[in-house]
């Protein structure tokens, strides 16, 4: 056998071992009765490049185990040492061993090769390498183990905090803690919610009238404006008049805002399809060049599907799946119940005691207010993450599965957002697509600058955030509106920092701090204390 090991950083030839005649008795033991037979007929040959070399004919009974052991031992940084074991001039001694060698199965690795590969003269340091945690190599390494460690530590710490909370305060959750008897008696809000489908039906009638050319385009726009405005103001009037509980009011306002957004998309899309149909009839545009259905038609079935589908952007047809996975739906429903319970536990056991034992963040001691905000930030973040998972992942996917709705990109990887602007583009895809389709690009097509178009989009978002929170709480101090509009300077700041430092980790940490650690807990405290002050005055 010729065994050669050629180090990368040395210019000398490999070490050549010359073994005496008949002196290479290599014996291996895998079991007590299993041995390796070594042929004594070895011949010396001369290598024209490196001098002397030894060629041996070795017959091994169990070579697969030895090969795997030798390969594992020869690995250094993912690259194996160049250990070559050749057998030339195969010798037959009456058995089939010579035939196997002649057939190409003579390249085997044994423990002798490993011993020669790691001789003291072989260099151990062959190239320049960085430490895994150095600044140049840390982002090229896999940190799955550290991630698992963080999860273990997080579970351990939170388990201790839960046990400590239960020992200190006891079980604070009451039966029916989210659905009180008063919320069940809010029948005006329930009736208002049940009558909301009247507005999509009215919009369909208007579209049918314009399709039959009974009314002109300006009349269509006026009627749609009245319908969409009434769909939003009607629930606001009912909530303010009935003085309902906050949860019932928030639910109704969310439904009303969704209906308004869908009606605007329905109206805008049909208007654009009518304009395209006229252009096609005139020959200005070819039907094949448009990614839309032609001829233009109004279908009640498409409107009904759109009103219940998990999307805010209307189109006549959607990508559909082949079937409904019933077992998958059941699993998601179980997850939805579990995470809703976790969210309720955190609210009752942590958030409510913290806000009850706090003072108004804009009044009193500044350090005490900062301490309350930071103490509230962690449970508030957990609730917000549970809310996101329950609604955007579980509920919307359940609804999409039941309706066989194909496009289920309800969110993207917003947790990796490097700027506030990127976060708003990733975390709520139904609203983002609606904003881009019906606010942002229409503004650009009408000559409005990009910065002003972004400002208008944030302004619309701020109005709806204020409606969904201020109306059910009966508090109109514009805290939610100001919070959303403050995102505009944060967009500029985080974009500037991202362009300056070119570091995604810095931008991501700034996003998490401003949005989840500072902003949301502050809004919770502001609305809670204003709500308690309002209740104190009314009582």
Swiss-Prot record:
Manganese: present as a keyword of the record?
A: no
Main subcellular location of this protein, as a coarse class: endoplasmic reticulum
Keyword Lipid metabolism part of the UniProt annotation: yes
- Annotated pathway: Glycerolipid metabolism; triacylglycerol biosynthesis
Compositional bias per record (Basic and acidic residues), positions renumbered to this chain: 56-80
Q: Where is this region: Disordered?
A: 1-104
List the catalytic activities from the record.
Answer: an acyl-CoA + a 1,2-diacyl-sn-glycerol = a triacyl-sn-glycerol + CoA
**What is this protein identified as?**
Diacylglycerol O-acyltransferase 1
Q: Which organism is it from?
A: Corylus americana
């Amino acid at each position: 056998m010729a065994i050669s090991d050629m180090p990368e950083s040395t210019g000398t030839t490999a070490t050549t071992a010359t073994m005496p005649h008949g002196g290479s008795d290599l014996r291996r033991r895998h079991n007590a009765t299993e041995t390796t037979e070594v042929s004594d007929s070895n011949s010396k040959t001369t290598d024209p490049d490196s001098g002397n070399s030894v060629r041996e004919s070795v017959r091994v009974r169990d070579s697969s185990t030895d090969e795997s052991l030798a390969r594992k031992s020869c690995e250094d940084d993912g690259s194996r040492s160049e250990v070559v074991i050749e057998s030339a001039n195969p010798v037959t001694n009456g058995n089939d061993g010579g035939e196997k060698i002649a057939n190409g199965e003579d390249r085997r690795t044994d423990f002798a090769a490993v011993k020669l590969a790691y001789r003291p003269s072989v260099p151990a340091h062959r190239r320049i390498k960085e430490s895994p945690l150095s600044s140049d190599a840390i982002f090229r390494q896999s940190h799955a183990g550290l991630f698992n460690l963080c999860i273990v530590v997080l579970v351990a710490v939170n388990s201790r905090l839960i046990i400590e909370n239960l020992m200190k305060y006891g079980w604070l959750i009451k039966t029916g803690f989210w659905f009180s008897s008063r919320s069940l008696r809010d029948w005006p809000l329930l009736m208002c919610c049940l009558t909301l489908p009247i507005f999509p039906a009215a919009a369909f009638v208007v579209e049918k009238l314009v399709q039959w050319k009974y009314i002109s385009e300006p009349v269509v726009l006026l009627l749609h404006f009245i319908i969409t405005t009434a769909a939003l103001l009607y629930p606001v009037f009912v909530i303010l008049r009935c003085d309902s509980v906050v949860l019932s009011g928030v639910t109704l306002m969310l439904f009303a805002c969704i209906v308004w957004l869908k009606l605007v998309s329905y109206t805008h899309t049909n208007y654009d399809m009518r304009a395209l149909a006229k252009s096609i009839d005139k020959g200005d545009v070819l039907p094949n060049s448009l990614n839309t259905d032609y001829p233009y038609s109004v279908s009640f079935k498409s409107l009904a599907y759109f009103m219940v589908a998990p999307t805010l952007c209307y189109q006549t047809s959607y990508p559909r799946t082949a079937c409904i996975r019933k077992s998958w739906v059941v699993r998601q429903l179980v997850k939805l119940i579990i995470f809703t319970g976790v969210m309720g536990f955190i609210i009752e056991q942590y958030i409510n005691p913290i806000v009850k034992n706090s003072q108004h963040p804009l009044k009193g001691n500044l350090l005490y207010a900062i301490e309350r905000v930071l103490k509230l930030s962690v449970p508030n973040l957990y609730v917000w993450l549970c809310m996101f998972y329950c609604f955007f992942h579980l509920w919307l996917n359940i609804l999409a599965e039941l309706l066989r709705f194909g496009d289920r990109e309800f969110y993207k990887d917003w947790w990796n957002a490097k700027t506030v602007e990127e976060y708003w583009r990733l975390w709520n895809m139904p609203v983002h697509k609606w904003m881009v389709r019906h606010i942002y690009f229409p503004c650009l097509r009408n000559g409005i600058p990009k910065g002003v178009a972004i400002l208008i989009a944030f302004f619309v978002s701020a109005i709806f955030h204020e409606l969904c929170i201020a109306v059910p709480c009966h508090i109109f101090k514009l805290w939610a509106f100001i919070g959303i509009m403050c995102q505009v300077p944060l967009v500029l700041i985080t974009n500037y920092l991202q362009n300056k430092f070119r570091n995604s980790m810095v931008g991501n940490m700034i996003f998490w701090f401003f949005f989840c650690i500072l902003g949301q807990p502050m809004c919770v405290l502001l609305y809670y204390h204003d709500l308690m002050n309002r209740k104190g005055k009314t009582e």
